[in-house]
Design a protein with these regions (language model features):
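Membrane-embedded segments
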Residues: 1-8, 12-15, 22
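Short Cys/His-rich micro-motifs in 6-15 aa windows
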Residues: 9-10, 96-98
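Sequence/structural segment immediately N-terminal to covalent heme-attachment motifs in c-type
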Residues: 19, 57-83, 93, 100, ...
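Axial heme c-ligation environment in periplasmic c-type cytochrome domains
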Residues: 2, 22-42, 57-60, 86-90, ...
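Extended intrinsically disordered, low-complexity coil regions enriched in Ser, Thr, Gly, Ala
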Residues: 11-13, 84-85, 101
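Extended non-catalytic domains of envelope/secretory-pathway proteins
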Residues: 8, 43, 51-54, 66
Length: 147
């Protein structure tokens, strides 16, 4: 992920950054096609997800896919804004970690995705973890930046 834009999956506080560095993270989105329905339902849902961020989409497909979003809401929230506690991304912004567009979203719904950031606690000293935490936090919290 981009560490400079201030959009964090698990929280961008120094404490959360350090926790991520020490313990690592496993991101898991299971395949959701069976919960969504038919391949046509998955395609419609993909257009609804695109609509959440104002991305180009087919309005009719998006309206048909809206009711299928219930399968996504447990992790991404009913509003699609994500849940940092789960590492579920915000679907209403223009940040697409694993590709953008109908094909990429459909593939994610059909196949799911597992990512891992390995724990660094066995590789770094306490001092190194502190310095790295400050560095990563500072990359997205530059002096004078308005947020």
């Amino acid at each position: 992920p981009n560490l400079t834009d201030g959009h964090w999956l698990h929280g961008g506080t120094p404490e959360k950054i350090r926790e991520t560095l020490e313990k690592g993270r496993i991101g898991n989105m299971p395949p959701m096609a069976a919960a969504v329905g038919s391949p046509e339902d998955v395609r419609n849902l993909s257009h609804y997800v695109l609509s959440l961020s104002g991305s180009p989409h087919d309005s009719l497909r998006a309206s048909l896919g809206k009711s299928k979003f219930v399968a996504c809401a447990a992790c991404h929230g009913a509003d699609g804004k994500g849940m940092q506690a789960l590492g579920a991304p915000n679907l209403t912004d223009d940040i697409w970690l694993h590709g953008w567009g109908e094909a990429a979203i459909t593939a994610m719904i059909n196949n799911g995705k597992v990512n891992q950031m390995p724990a660094q606690s066995q590789k770094l000293t306490e001092a190194q973890l502190g310095v790295l935490t400050a560095y990563v936090w500072g990359m997205s919290n530059k002096p004078g930046s308005a947020r």
